[in-house]
């Protein structure tokens, strides 16, 4: 058994094992690609505030990949007495760290952009000698931004967005979503640079503000999603748009058991895997341990994401439990 095939006590199916290996490769590729991008932009950043903001955004975009790869080291570990539920929350913590970092730096950049606009800072973009020719540095800035956008928009962004639902990984989904939207930063930075070139100085600051607001929005979304998941909200899909359908499947399965009259479930997302608390109202007064064990095994077989299952016979279903309707 390979380490990529184990999440806590859950052994991943072949599809998920392949997906996690691909995700790791894409995250490593993204780090290398973005590092090269950061170095190239540093050579041409000049005094353009829009370019500086785009440059910083590229640095921030490394956080989700580092958080994902770091969290992956923890979620593979089996539960212990010290951590009886395993370390699956590490993925949610990584998601939260990424969101807070984006939000904090985005706010700082937005304040800087607004301050520059209010004070009327006029950025200047000079010329450079290249192959014996004098070239306006702005053209190099535009060329660099056009080239570097190819990776996130056309390659690793779409690739990660296909892997995120397979792995039920919200951090990977957020990473892919930000990468696919990177074209907005590119367009804004190009507009800011060209604005300086034609004498509209405030376009540079406005572009920097636009990019900053995008960073703030990414930070807010990721922070909000991570916090509500860590606070054990009702388990939702990888994109957080809908309640996860597995809850309904579990309730339907339990109701199909001949000894179960009614059933409901509380399901929380541990970070890629679920902890299940199922409540059943038996048709008869006594329930055997065999019945409970067989039902728990059946629930586990429904989906690879089922990590822990607890089934409690009750006289009345809890109001907060999901009846699957």
Pin down the residues of each PLM region.
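Peripheral (non-transmembrane) domains and long loops of multi-pass membrane proteins
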Residues: 1-27, 77, 219-325
């Amino acid at each position: 058994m390979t380490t990529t095939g184990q999440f806590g006590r859950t052994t991943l199916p072949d599809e998920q094992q392949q997906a996690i290996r691909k995700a790791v490769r894409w995250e490593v590729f993204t780090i290398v690609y973005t590092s090269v991008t950061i170095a190239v932009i540093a050579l041409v950043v000049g005094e353009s505030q829009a370019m500086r903001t785009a440059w910083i955004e590229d640095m921030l975009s490394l956080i989700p990949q580092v958080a994902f790869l770091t969290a992956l080291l923890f979620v593979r570990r089996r539960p212990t007495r010290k951590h009886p539920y395993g370390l699956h929350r590490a993925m949610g913590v990584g998601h939260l760290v990424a969101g807070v970092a984006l939000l904090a730096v985005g706010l700082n950049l937005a304040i800087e952009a607004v301050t520059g606009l209010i004070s009327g800072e006029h950025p200047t973009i000079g010329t450079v000698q290249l192959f014996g020719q004098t070239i306006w540095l702005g053209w190099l800035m535009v060329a660099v931004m056009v080239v570097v956008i190819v990776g996130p928009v056309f390659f690793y962004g779409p690739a990660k967005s296909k892997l995120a639902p397979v792995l039920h990984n919200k951090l990977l989904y957020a990473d892919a979503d930000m990468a696919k939207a990177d074209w907005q930063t590119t367009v804004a930075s190009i507009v800011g640079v060209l604005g300086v070139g034609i004498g509209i100085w405030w376009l540079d600051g406005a572009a920097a503000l636009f990019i900053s607001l995008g960073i703030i929005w990414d930070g807010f979304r990721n922070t909000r999603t991570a916090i509500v998941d860590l606070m054990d909200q009702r388990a939702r899909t990888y994109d957080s748009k809908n309640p996860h359908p597995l809850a309904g499947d579990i309730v339907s399965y339990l109701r199909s058991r001949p000894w179960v009259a009614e059933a409901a479930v509380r399901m929380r997302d541990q970070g890629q895997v679920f902890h299940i608390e199922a409540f059943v109202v038996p048709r008869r007064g006594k329930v055997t341990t065999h019945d409970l064990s067989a039902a728990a095994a059946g629930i586990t077989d429904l989906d690879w994401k089922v990590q822990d299952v607890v089934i409690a016979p009750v006289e009345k279903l809890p109001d907060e439990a999901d009846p699957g309707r």
